[in-house]
Amino acid sequence: MKQPIVAIMYDFDKTLCTKDMQEYAFIPALGMSSSAFWGEVNAMTDAEEMDNILAYMYKMVEKAKEKKVPITRDTFQKMGSKVEYFDGVKTWFERINAYGEKVGVRVEHYIVSSGIKEIIEGTEIARFFKKIYACEFMYDYNGSIQWPKFAVNYTAKTQFLFRINKGVLTIDSKSADKLNRFTPENERRV
């Protein structure tokens, strides 16, 4: 008999780690305080009537250029090694997987975060996630940021609950139709 799948979805910032992920390595590399950086993000959000997530992504790029801090996929992933977790997080995944096995279910872990995907990919817990849905940048052939590739704001997070539930995990030109199509409960993957 096929094991039922139980999906556990996590936010990242202030849920698995103790503060916003940018505050461990990125903001210090700019020589700024967290309050100054987020203050600028909020001021831009208000002045431009802008999505707060796009505003922080813009400010990350703007401030990195201004302070001559190189940011690439690789540097973001290295910043992931600086993330600090709440007590028990590092052992949680293996413990809950073992419990799932004991009770006859397969446990899958997913991230649905407004944080930076590349930083999460560089964390020591990234290997436990089947899929990481988070804000992401597009890079040129030199590895430099070109544009926001994906922004996961607070209301957009719900689409990932449906993606996981229906088993439409890939984001591509064909997935929107599959995602929006009615799927009877008994045909859903999770």
Language-model region placement:
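Alpha-helical substrate-recognition element adjacent to the catalytic core
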Residues: 1-145
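Conserved acidic, metal-coordinating active-site core of Asp-based
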Residues: 130, 134-190
